[in-house]
């Protein structure tokens, strides 16, 4: 992974529950630049499984309608890193979380590190928090790839709701 692991440990039970995609960033704008872009997904819920994997419930636009998807993130030896199978992305790395307000994560293709990197800022409420957004921006600056923040789902009417 090109994404530095900054989390010492991740308490999966504490990340459980409802989340909202508050901001998105990517190394390649085309991954997110339209409502049908492949990695423009809206996280809804994180559900830890009994085997310490993480089930991610998300929504995205497909064929002019909003659909719900479920992705299984499988644990690795590293507490904040998971293997996933979603398009070409096969790694999910939790950058930072305080469990109660925010969680930052990135998706990466481990076979082509640094080429396609998409990161999201999740929050527990839909209220935009400048402090959290600044923290997310700082977290993005620690990445070895130039990742630009350019999409704020809260400002966009097309946010996918079911």
From Swiss-Prot:
Q: Which PROSITE patterns match?
A: LIPOCALIN
What are the protein's UniProt keywords?
Disulfide bond, Milk protein, Retinol-binding, Secreted, Transport
Molecular functions (GO terms): retinol binding
Domain of life, source organism: Eukaryota
* Transport in keyword set: yes
Please explain the role this protein plays, according to its UniProt record: Lactoglobulin is the primary component of whey, it binds retinol and is probably involved in the transport of that molecule.
Family under the similarity heading: Belongs to the calycin superfamily. Lipocalin family.
Q: Return the protein name.
A: Beta-lactoglobulin-3
Question: By which gene is this protein encoded?
Answer: LGB3
């Amino acid at each position: 992974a090109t994404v530095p692991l900054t989390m010492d440990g991740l308490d999966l039970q504490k990340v459980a529950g409802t989340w909202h995609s508050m901001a998105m960033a990517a190394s390649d704008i085309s991954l997110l630049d339209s409502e049908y872009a492949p990695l423009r997904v809206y996280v809804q819920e994180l559900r830890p499984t009994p085997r310490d994997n993480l089930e991610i419930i998300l929504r995205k636009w497909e064929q002019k309608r909003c659909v719900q998807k479920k992705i299984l993130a499988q644990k690795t030896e590293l507490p904040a890193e998971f293997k996933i199978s979603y398009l070409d992305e096969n790694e999910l790395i939790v950058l930072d979380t305080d469990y109660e307000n925010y969680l930052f994560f990135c998706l990466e293709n481990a076979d082509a590190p640094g080429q396609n990197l998409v990161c999201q800022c999740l929050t527990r409420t839909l209220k935009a928090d400048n402090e959290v957004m600044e923290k997310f921006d700082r977290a993005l600056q620690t990445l070895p790839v130039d990742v630009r923040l350019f999409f704020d789902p809260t400002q966009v009417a097309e946010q996918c709701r079911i």
